[in-house]
């Protein structure tokens, strides 16, 4: 738990709709910090993780403009568990440090840290006052990701397979947003949670 902010950990599998939930919370005034955006900045040209990644994996995973070649790195990480662990050992501490900095500087009644692999990373668990999982059936996840990313079904299933199961996420959740319906249904649930988080933040603040 962070001493300065009431902190919500927001997570969900790929295609669950956690970005839509996070965007709504930001609209309502929460300070939203997205670890995916932090990871992109770290692996953009000149990003702090580029040289350690180059040292570990060579130029094959760096684009000509000096960014991480996401496809090459994803293919390597999926085919080689050791490579995935090596990449995580570079990226995760850097994400943790930058997210901590952004939480400290956050403006808003409470902070939301969006972490795709929150449940998988037990080291994070003691940070949060509440863990919120955005949930939907796996077949809905697959259809959304195939539509959005134009990936074949087997590749989407492979991504889902390395994430924690739906059951594991739900077991770890303090709060669950059911995103199997439309955006209006998602927003209604997010709005209710926002009111609860506001009240809890005021009570602890």
From Swiss-Prot:
SUPFAM superfamilies associated with the record: P-loop containing nucleoside triphosphate hydrolases (SSF52540)
**Reaction(s) catalysed (UniProt annotation):** 3'-dephospho-CoA + ATP = ADP + CoA + H(+)
Q: Is the keyword Magnesium assigned to this protein?
A: no
Q: Which compartments is it annotated to reside in?
A: Cytoplasm
Q: Provide the DPCK domain boundaries.
A: 7-204
Q: Which CDD domains match?
A: DPCK
| UniProt KW keywords | ATP-binding, Coenzyme A biosynthesis, Cytoplasm, Kinase, Nucleotide-binding, Transferase
Residue sites binding ATP per the record: 15-20
- Give the main localization category: cytoplasm
Look up the record and name the pathway of this protein: Cofactor biosynthesis; coenzyme A biosynthesis; CoA from (R)-pantothenate: step 5/5
Q: Does the keyword Flavoprotein apply?
A: no
Kindly give the InterPro entries that the UniProt entry links to this protein.
Answer: Depp_CoAkinase, P-loop_NTPase
User: Gene3D superfamilies per the record?
Assistant: P-loop containing nucleotide triphosphate hydrolases
* Gene Ontology terms: biological process: coenzyme A biosynthetic process
Molecular-function GO terms, alphabetical: ATP binding; dephospho-CoA kinase activity
Function text: Catalyzes the phosphorylation of the 3'-hydroxyl group of dephosphocoenzyme A to form coenzyme A.
- Matching PANTHER family, A to Z? BIFUNCTIONAL COENZYME A SYNTHASE-RELATED (PTHR10695:SF46), DEPHOSPHO-COA KINASE-RELATED (PTHR10695)
The cross-references to NCBIfam families, in alphabetical order and at most eight, read:
dephospho-CoA kinase
Family, per entry = Belongs to the CoaE family.
Q: What is this protein called?
A: Dephospho-CoA kinase
């Amino acid at each position: 738990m962070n001493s300065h902010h009431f902190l919500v950990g927001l997570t969900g599998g790929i295609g669950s709709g956690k970005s839509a939930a996070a965007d709504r919370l930001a609209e309502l005034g929460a300070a939203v910090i997205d670890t995916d955006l932090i990871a992109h900045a770290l692996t953009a040209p000149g990003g702090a993780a580029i040289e350690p990644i180059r040292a570990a994996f060579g130029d094959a995973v760096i684009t000509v403009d000096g960014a991480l070649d996401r496809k090459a790195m994803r293919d390597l990480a999926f085919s080689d568990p050791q490579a995935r662990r090596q990449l995580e050992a570079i990226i995760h501490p850097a994400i943790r440090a930058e997210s901590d900095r952004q939480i400290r500087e956050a403006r808003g009644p409470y902070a939301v840290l969006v972490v795709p692999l929150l449940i998988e990373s037990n080291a994070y668990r003691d940070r949060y006052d509440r863990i919120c999982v955005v949930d939907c059936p796996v077949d809905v996840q697959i259809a959304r990701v195939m539509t959005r990313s134009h990936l074949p079904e087997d590749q989407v299933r492979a991504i889902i397979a390395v994430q924690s199961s739906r059951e594991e996420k739900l077991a770890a959740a303090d709060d669950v947003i059911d995103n199997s319906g439309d955006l209006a249904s998602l927003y209604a649930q997010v709005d209710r949670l926002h009111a609860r988080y506001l009240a809890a933040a005021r009570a602890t603040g």
